[in-house]
UniProtKB/Swiss-Prot annotation:
Enzyme Commission code(s) on record: 7.1.2.2
Keyword ATP-binding listed: yes
Record-given protein name: V-type ATP synthase alpha chain
Designated gene of the protein: atpA
Keywords: ATP synthesis, ATP-binding, Hydrogen ion transport, Ion transport, Nucleotide-binding, Translocase, Transport
Lineage: Bacteria, Thermotogati, Deinococcota, Deinococci, Deinococcales
Gene Ontology biological process terms in this record: proton motive force-driven plasma membrane ATP synthesis; proton transmembrane transport
NCBIfam families associated with the record: PRK04192.1 (NF003220)
Record's keyword annotation contains Transport: yes
Catalytic activity: ATP + H2O + 4 H(+)(in) = ADP + phosphate + 5 H(+)(out)
InterPro entries: ATP-synt_VA_C (IPR055190), ATP-synth_a_Xtn (IPR031686), ATP_synth_asu-like_sf (IPR023366), ATPase_a/bsu_AS (IPR020003), ATPase_F1/V1/A1_a/bsu_N (IPR004100), ATPase_F1/V1/A1_a/bsu_N_sf (IPR036121), ATPase_F1/V1/A1_a/bsu_nucl-bd (IPR000194), ATPase_F1/V1_b/a_C (IPR024034)
Amino acid sequence: MTQQKQGVVQSIAGPAVIAKGMYGAKMYDIVRVGQERLVGEIIRLDGDTAFVQVYEDTAGLTVGEPVETTGLPLSVELGPGMLNGIYDGIQRPLDKIREASGNFIARGIEVSSLNREQKWDFTPSVQAGDTVTGSGILGTVPEFSFTHKILVPPEVQGRLRSVAPAGQYTIDDTIAELEDGTKLRLAHYWPVRAPRPVQKKLDPSLPFLTGMRILDVMFPLVMGGAAAIPGPFGSGKTVTQQSVAKYGNADIVVYVGCGERGNEMTDVLVEFPELEDPKTGGPLMHRTILIANTSNMPVAAREASVYTGVTLAEYFRDQGYSVSLMADSTSRWAEALREISSRLEEMPAEEGYPPYLGAKLAAFYERAGAVKTLAGEDGAVSVIGAVSPAGGDMSEPVTQATLRITGAFWRLDAGLARRRHFPAINWNGSYSLFTPILDKWYRENVGPDFPELRQRIGSLLQQEAALQEVVQLVGPDALQDNERLIIETGRMLRQDFLQQNGFDPVDASASMPKNYGLMKMFLKFYDEAEAALRNGLTIDEIIQNPVIEKLARARYTPENEFMAYGEGVMDELDQTFKAVKA
């Protein structure tokens, strides 16, 4: 009996389409729906009835139109040409779509994910007779200032019968052939819902440095860790993620705009090409991939966009690179899940979200990690997901589910954002589970007393927050001098250490040696001032000391001048309080 590969539309509910007669179809197969051949994916099967989520607008689709299955899962094409690219949620390049259909995305449009005409300079690193395994490296291709390693597809292994000589090839040309006849190209396909296999996951030991003092010092993230940035609207989630994308120490950045405003993606597209990559000196876009799935694009494609993004990140991880994946925002993704679930008439759980929300979020975040690849390379994917709880309610299901999965929680505060405090991360409401893991690295690479200094700063900020409540009730005059000193030191730490000026070329990003120097300066001021109070100096005399202004200017000092500036301030602190000690 021949299996029928084509069915018909039985009912339509927004992006959810039910098709009858889908014999031989499999879960997560890609289908073409209607005369316009809209792209969809089977998400439930019941006999010959398939439930399809359509990645394009279904307006005008009618009952009885054909539904044809391709027999393949939703896959992305992985190879040279992805860097500097901007795609929609299912890896269709937006510049090619614009050439084909103008400024608006036409329905049913088919464009190649990668440039099939461009020739790449391939240099083989294997030869005929060698045995290759999944994710093994066949050779390299230069892409901008980046060395793109050509990988064997993860499920392929065997002995090489032939390898193409060094030269120029397109992504469709055969560059190697196995003895069993399998042909290998510069690119290969991989299904987005399947994590790429690895040899083993590694214990994280290196920090993912963001250039933001509050994150790198107080709430660090490991290379290969997962962090959440929850916050109400307008608190700076997108700006924080864009800043991490600009200044983070990852080799590759994958930025997924999932259901956010189109203007925010435009900001990225306008800003990133103008930004200089501190590592290479070239444009930052040359190591960035953007996936733009704005709020007015079909809901179902949002659900796919985060999987597309993490699959691209895993591909570069398998080449031995560290990759940062920004998902902005996972709440919009969860809303897409909720809408599709309600269209399919599934039983809702809390706030209408499907019961499997936690499992889906975990499946996404668990694809982060530092790994040893099948070929023996060390790579990492660090995931930073924004969460947009309605009204800033941190008890809503998406925030709570994310909280259980991620290891760093960077809570944004609308009050800080209104006060123009950037980054608006609440130092009393955030935490990182990676701090004890990274203490050894900080001791060896930054300063032997770094963890103790961080702990003291955290303690001072907590004491200041408690005293501020007293000040609001009875005023500052009710406090003793040593308590007023804590409030003054806390203010200095907030304004001159945790706060950064994103528009200042020096202060927008800070290195760890500079952060360490600033920590020592502020804590030395507190220690010397506390001793001076005990020796008879008043708090007003300390507050009026000109050295405070020099401490405030320290963060604007360029890296190459900072050591000399810091030594000068430390000497001045010694001189200022020396007379009091005597």
